């Protein structure tokens, strides 16, 4: 569309410029000729130029209307802000045509819609990223939960032991209890993970979500300040006796905890051994029963097999006897057949000889 507008604008401007040069050149270049002719020509040229200007204005208005309609349709279809092709095209359009108030209003409305959509998309993307980060932190906490629980138990035991040592060593002195940097970092890490796991629950897309985020940021800042204060306090504290007592207390607490765990595991081992012995006795009983059943089944199978084999032998012997009898009967039958054939032949000869004798006797009588 922009290229078509440029081509049309350039062609109309060039024609108009040529007409202006023709109209002005006749009056300036030939001052010595007749004024009547010049006046007539200038009038005819002026009339033609006005008619051409009117036609061009009509064409421009039609093109502007078509372009505005096309822009409105494009904005409605794609909901985008109309982009300007180049600075020269904008200047030419501004010089040729005045801005349309309807087009301005549509552009402002489209800009407001685009800005609202952009804000909504950015807020949704930000909330989705936060939810993903919280879910990842929750998964990490679930993976390392046992380590964190062990660290919490160790830190609580160390706190109790440190309090007892402080009471013993510093009776009558009101000094603040010092916590080691490692214990504090462990506690801080655990508290962070618990907060992240609590905040990783399904979030509602409302103002309360951002308020919770602000509260979490405030808590993190307070925690960082406390950490800095404790690091400064541990750096300025130069008495090695409490640290030694803390180390001894930590070792004693660990030893006691390990002893308790060993006793508990020994009791579990004894219980498991008793269970294993019971199952071994049951296994032996079941094995003996299975052996007896196997023997019985094998004996029964052998008996059945022996009976079947005997029956097979008997049937085979009977079959052989029957085959022998059938063969003998077949031979006797063949012999009888041969005898019958011989007798039939003799009978036929005898009957033929008798007929011949009867025929000869009447001939002799004649």
From Swiss-Prot:
It comes from the Eukaryota. GO terms for cellular component: Golgi apparatus. Residues 20-105 are annotated as: Disordered. InterPro entries: GKAP1. It is found in: Golgi apparatus. Its main location: Golgi. The keyword NADP does not apply. Residues 46-77, 129-160, 250-299, 326-353 form a coiled coil. One of its GO terms (molecular function) is identical protein binding. Residues 39-50 have a biased composition (Polar residues). Keywords: Coiled coil, Golgi apparatus, Phosphoprotein. The modification Phosphoserine is found at residues 23, 25, 27, 106. Residues 1-95 are annotated as: Interaction with IRS1. GO terms for biological process: positive regulation of insulin receptor signaling pathway; signal transduction. Interacts with PRKG1 and IRS1. Regulates insulin-dependent IRS1 tyrosine phosphorylation in adipocytes by modulating the availability of IRS1 to IR tyrosine kinase. Its association with IRS1 is required for insulin-induced translocation of SLC2A4 to the cell membrane. Involved in TNF-induced impairment of insulin-dependent IRS1 tyrosine phosphorylation. Belongs to the GKAP1 family. This is G kinase-anchoring protein 1. It comes from Rattus norvegicus.
């Amino acid at each position: 569309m922009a290229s078509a507008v440029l081509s049309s604008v350039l062609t109309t401007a060039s024609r108009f410029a040529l007409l202006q040069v023709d109209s002005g050149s006749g009056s300036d270049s030939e001052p010595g000729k007749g004024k009547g002719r010049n006046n007539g020509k200038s009038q005819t040229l002026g009339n033609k130029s006005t008619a051409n200007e009117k036609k061009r204005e009509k064409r421009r208005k039609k093109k502007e209307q078509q372009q505005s309609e096309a822009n409105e349709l494009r904005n409605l279809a794609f909901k985008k802000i109309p982009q300007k092709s180049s600075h020269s095209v904008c200047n030419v359009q501004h010089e040729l045509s005045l801005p349309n108030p309807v087009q301005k209003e549509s552009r402002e409305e489209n800009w407001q819609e685009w800005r609202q959509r952009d804000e909504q998309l950015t807020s949704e993307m930000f909330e989705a990223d936060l939810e993903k980060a919280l879910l990842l932190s929750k998964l990490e906490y679930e993976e390392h939960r046992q380590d964190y629980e062990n660290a919490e138990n160790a830190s609580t035991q160390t706190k109790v032991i440190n309090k007892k040592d402080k009471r013993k060593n510093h009776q009558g002195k009101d000094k603040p209890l010092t916590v080691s940097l490692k214990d504090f970092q462990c506690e801080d890490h655990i508290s962070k993970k618990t907060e992240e796991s609590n905040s990783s629950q399904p979030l509602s897309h409302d103002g309360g979500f951002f308020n919770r985020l602000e509260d979490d940021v405030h808590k993190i800042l307070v925690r960082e300040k406390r950490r800095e204060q404790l690091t400064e306090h541990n750096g300025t504290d130069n008495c090695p006796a409490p640290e030694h007592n803390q180390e001894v207390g930590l070792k004693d607490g660990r030893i006691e905890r390990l002893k308790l765990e060993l006793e508990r595991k020994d009791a579990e081992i004894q219980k498991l051994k008793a269970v294993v012995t019971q199952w071994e006795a049951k296994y032996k009983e079941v094995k003996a029963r299975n052996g007896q059943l196997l023997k019985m089944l094998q004996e029964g199978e052998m008996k059945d097999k022996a009976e079947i084999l005997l029956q097979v032998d008997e049937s085979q012997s009977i079959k052989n006897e029957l085959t022998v009898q059938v063969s003998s009967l077949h031979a006797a039958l063949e012999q009888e057949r041969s005898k019958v054939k011989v007798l039939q032949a003799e009978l036929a000869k005898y009957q033929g000889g008798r007929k011949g004798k009867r025929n000869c006797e009447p001939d002799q009588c004649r």
